[in-house]
Amino acid sequence: LLYGGEELDLEGETIKILHTPGHSHGSICIMCEESKACFTGDTIFDIDLGRTDLNCGSQKEMEDSIRNVISKWDNSITIYPGHDVSATMKQVRKYNTEYLAIMQGTGDGN
């Protein structure tokens, strides 16, 4: 199991485990710092966020994860979600209406 706050070294690549609850209480993102890549699972996608209406999902936790973790990522980071297409954070900040709504304080974008 991987837990938020863990750091791993994989042949010179620093891998950080980031706890990003919202889609589920145990959601994580896996940040590869040197490669500027983040595997986001079902937390964030190119144009929307993971569902929070399923068992163990929480809109408040998702909003906290966006504000306290994901919003701090550099525009050059490429996200690789669990499905759908990859995107840079620059693209996310332009096209992801749910992300933008949370950052602007207007809700979840729905």
Region spans (language model):
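Short acidic-hydrophobic, aromatic-tinged amphipathic segments that line or gate anion-handling sites
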Residues: 1-4
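Metallo-beta-lactamase
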Residues: 7, 14-19, 24-109
